[in-house]
Amino acid sequence: MLHLAEGSSLIPADAYERALMHQWLFWEQYSHETAIAVRRFQKTYLKKPESEIDLSLKPKGEGALTLMNRHLADRNYFVMDRLTLADIALVAYTRWADEAGFDLNDWPSVCQWVVRIESELGLEPQT
């Protein structure tokens, strides 16, 4: 993803802003994807009943969505005031959170952000 976006406005030119973008990209891989995407995979593709899904995934996903909601409470994007790769990486699984058992209406700032990013990227709405 970084290679494909090199030289575009999706990667901030400013070193500090670029570091913030990387911080969110790393966080997505370690704290977000590992809960929301894994739960979605187990529920949607493996068709596991709730009782067979790793119990730690639900609170971990709720924690990730809560942190995102707090961060987005007073901003429209994760880094700066415009779309970056951080938003693209985070929207990928967040927009499918309902399939993982998370109701995004419980995180209104995240819900509004998903709608905004889907619109900007021309994606079919999932929420």
Mark where each language-model region is.
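Amphipathic alpha-helical packing segments from all-alpha helical-bundle domains
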Residues: 54-72
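Structural helix-adjacent loops and short alpha-helical linkers that scaffold large soluble proteins
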Residues: 9, 55-56, 101-108
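Alpha-helix C-capping/helix-to-loop hinge sites
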Residues: 4-8, 48, 74-75, 95-100
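Surface-exposed helix-capping loop/turn segments at secondary-structure junctions
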Residues: 7, 70-82, 121-127
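GST superfamily/GST-like fold recognition
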Residues: 36-40, 78-103, 116-117
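Domain-level recognition of soluble alpha/beta enzyme cores
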Residues: 21, 108-110
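GST-like domain detector, emphasizing the conserved glutathione-binding G-site
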Residues: 1-55, 69
